[in-house]
Curated annotation (Swiss-Prot):
NCBIfam families: bL25_bact_ctc (TIGR00731), PRK05618.1-2 (NF004128), PRK05618.1-5 (NF004130), PRK05943.1 (NF004612). This is one of the proteins that binds to the 5S RNA in the ribosome where it forms part of the central protuberance. This is Large ribosomal subunit protein bL25. One of its GO terms (cellular component) is cytosolic large ribosomal subunit. The keyword Isomerase does not apply. The gene is rplY. PANTHER family: RIBOSOMAL PROTEIN L25/GLN-TRNA SYNTHETASE, ANTI-CODON-BINDING DOMAIN-CONTAINING PROTEIN (PTHR33284), RIBOSOMAL PROTEIN L25_GLN-TRNA SYNTHETASE, ANTI-CODON-BINDING DOMAIN-CONTAINING PROTEIN (PTHR33284:SF1). It comes from Neisseria meningitidis serogroup C / serotype 2a (strain ATCC 700532 / DSM 15464 / FAM18). The lineage of its organism: Bacteria, Pseudomonadati, Pseudomonadota, Betaproteobacteria, Neisseriales. InterPro entries: Rbsml_bL25/Gln-tRNA_synth_N, Ribosomal_bL25/Gln-tRNA_synth, Ribosomal_bL25_b-dom, Ribosomal_bL25_C, Ribosomal_bL25_long, Ribosomal_bL25_short, Ribosomal_L25_dom, Ribosomal_uL5_bac-type.
């Protein structure tokens, strides 16, 4: 899915200026990367808030329009208000199509309900890590990674090497020879 966000350069910075922006329905943010100086920006709160609720937005290549120029960016970080449903700040990183990006991608369990551990042994598959750090070109970043649990039995431990990575995507931990556990399979308690 492609996301497009309109942004404007913000001149005033600081706590007071940020509060004024939020009252006007804007989110203060920053755009950095691609060998340029960081730029203080403001984006529409409603657009970003509802986009952040979608899991794919966190790893998507976003078209950010700023001063009539469109840049390819990814969401690098964001802060939420402690108890209101409100985004306080967002960081975008500009990326180049030919340079790999390091990003965390969500992990999904698939086929667990068909596994022997769940069907016959009454067990469950539990994620130890909900995301995996990968390196890929911006166009190759997957929205999520699947962990196939069709063949698991109670007592199994699934590792990074059990995840089938799409072409052009590499696990940061596996590159460092760290085959971390990502899920466990437990049987029914007696």
């Amino acid at each position: 899915m492609t996301y497009e966000i309109q942004a404007s350069v913000r001149e005033a910075q600081g706590t007071g200026a940020s509060r004024r922006l939020r009252r006007e329905g804007q989110i203060p943010g920053i755009l950095y990367g691609e060998g340029q100086e960081p730029v203080a920006i403001a984006v529409d709160h409603k657009t970003v808030f509802y986009a952040l609720e979608k899991e794919s937005f966190h790893t998507a290549l976003i078209k950010l329009s700023l001063n009539g120029e469109t840049k390819d960016v990814i969401v690098r970080d964001f802060q939420m208000h402690p108890f209101r449903r409100e985004v306080q700040h967002i960081d975008f990183q500009a990326v180049k199509a030919d340079q790999p990006v390091r990003i965390r991608v969500p992990l999904h369990i698939v086929n667990a309900e068909n596994s022997q551990a769940v069907k016959l042994q009454g067990g469950r598959v539990s994620l130890l890590n909900t995301s995996v750090e990968v390196v890929a070109l911006p166009a190759n970043i997957p929205a999520f990674l699947d962990l196939d649990c069709a063949e698991v039995v109670a007592g199994d431990i699934l590792h990074l090497s059990d995840i089938k990575l799409p072409e052009g995507v590499e696990s940061v931990s596996l590159k460092r020879n760290e085959n971390l556990a990502v899920a466990t399979v437990t049987g029914k308690k007696r």
